[in-house]
Amino acid sequence: MTDLPDTDFTQRFIFDESDTRGELVALERSYAEVLAKHPYPEPVAQLLGELMAAASLLVGTLKFDGLLILQARSEGPVPLLMIECSSEREIRGLARYDAEQIAPDATLADLMPNGVLALTVDPTNGQRYQGIVDLDGTNLAECFTNYFVMSQQTGTRFWLYADGRSARGLLLQQLPADRLRDQEERDASWQHLTALASTLTADELLSLDNETVLHRLYHEEAVRLFDVQPLRFRCSCSRERSGNALVSLGLEDAQQLVVEHGGSIEIDCQFCNERYLFDAADIAQLFAGAGVDTPSDTRH
């Protein structure tokens, strides 16, 4: 295997004697970028890391060109977790929370009671798809496993861990019958491989490299590990997009906002905290059809 290109990547593997594939994800730099944007309490930071790991694994599983959006919503101390990951493996995320209601040892059920998990695939070309499942697992990994149980026949299992410094994940998924045609053999192989994966501890997945993880779990299996696929943090916000949002309000409302806000409107990106400032001259330019003045992108 070649040297790893970065701290953030996914890596696929397959079992030569079973109709099962797997994927591992490691996130450090992009995870740190997301956490640096807001002072997240530790339990919230852990959930964000787990959701980032899940999104990274899913982008490699759901073959499409476009954007994957994961949203967990609830009526509890964490009303929203949101991760976006593109097919180009660019990822960003955020959470909304009430810090005063979050205990250091809070569980998923404590943080997001009566919650739902929505998975949205927004392809560049084609129809948008969304699936929703209750947040009824003891952790996010169980919730994603439940989602796949409800939405498709293919067996899929997740293991997700994060500690505020790194986020890791493991996915196992059944493939169409090829090597094992007998259904009982397929079921037995699947149960065997997932049972071994369930022996993996959070400390092991968070601290060990992929080759060591796979050796510890499957040293008696024939496993092939493929090249890594890098990921990175990148926010898709821009001055142009912010300007388009103002145009959608209409000229009169946009001008009124400028007046109400003392001569300029400040639009903040919730993902990266970037700020875009628009004054009366900018509004006039937008509605004159000239678009956004590129040099003013530097104004925050």
From Swiss-Prot:
Localization annotation: Cytoplasm
Pfam families documented for this protein: HSP33
Keyword entries, A-Z: Chaperone, Cytoplasm, Disulfide bond, Redox-active center, Zinc
InterPro entries assigned: Heat_shock_Hsp33, Heat_shock_Hsp33_C, Heat_shock_Hsp33_N, Hsp33_helix_hairpin_bin_dom_sf
Keyword Disulfide bond: yes
Disulfide bonds: 235-237, 269-272
Gene Ontology, cellular component aspect: cytoplasm
A Gene Ontology biological process term: protein refolding
Chief place where the protein resides: cytoplasm
Modified how: Under oxidizing conditions two disulfide bonds are formed involving the reactive cysteines. Under reducing conditions zinc is bound to the reactive cysteines and the protein is inactive.
GO molecular-function term, one example from the UniProt record: unfolded protein binding
Matching HAMAP family: HslO (MF_00117)
Job description of the protein: Redox regulated molecular chaperone. Protects both thermally unfolding and oxidatively damaged proteins from irreversible aggregation. Plays an important role in the bacterial defense system toward oxidative stress.
Homology family: Belongs to the HSP33 family.
NCBIfam families: PRK00114.1 (NF001033)
The protein's name: 33 kDa chaperonin
Species in which this protein is naturally found: Pseudomonas fluorescens (strain ATCC BAA-477 / NRRL B-23932 / Pf-5)
